[in-house]
Amino acid sequence: MKTLIHAVPERMWYVEEFLIPALRAQGAEKIEIWNDEAHEGNLAACMASFAAREGDGGTWHLQDDVLPCRDFVKRCRELDDGVVFGFCCRNFGDRLDAFGQVYAPDAWNSFQCVRIPDAYARECAAWVRSMRWDKESPSAELPILWKLGKGDDTFFHEFLACRHPYDVVENVKPNLVEHIDWLLGGSTLLHWRDYLARAEFWDDEDLIAALRARIKARV
């Protein structure tokens, strides 16, 4: 099981002090960090990390603002094949009834935790970089996101729908992680949000209370 954490410098304190120790405590061994030190933006940094994947295995991609469930590593090892989405956000328009094995167009769009075959990651990066998004986009949203340098999740979802529409992917319920940007100072992308982007299916609420206490004690 390989894990890649997508991070920005502002969140490295959480990644190093809390997230990686939590993963290692569950037995995770191969953990990498892709730190966007140059602040290229989430799309450019994500595609660069995708292009750099090697081999024919797969990698679990985590954002730097997630809390893994108490049996995260065990469940990931059981699901360590193909494309797997481990997070569903109640406010991102994901189909809440589409869990288990679904065709790629019904994959959850949320990108906080997703397993991607390394060959698919490389293919996605090449596809995104090769498209002329102002003229060839399959949707009106993508050219805007391209100009803003955002929307890594949306581009990957579009990649699956366009290039691998008949692939069967896994939407995991209960979710494998909870999104806790609100606990870490808010979204580094938007800097505002009128709702909490929380997991729809999350069973380990006590872990959030414990983490909140540890972060408070750190200050």
What residue spans do the PLM features occupy?
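Peripheral/terminal regions associated with large enzymatic or DNA-binding modules
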Residues: 1-62, 66-219
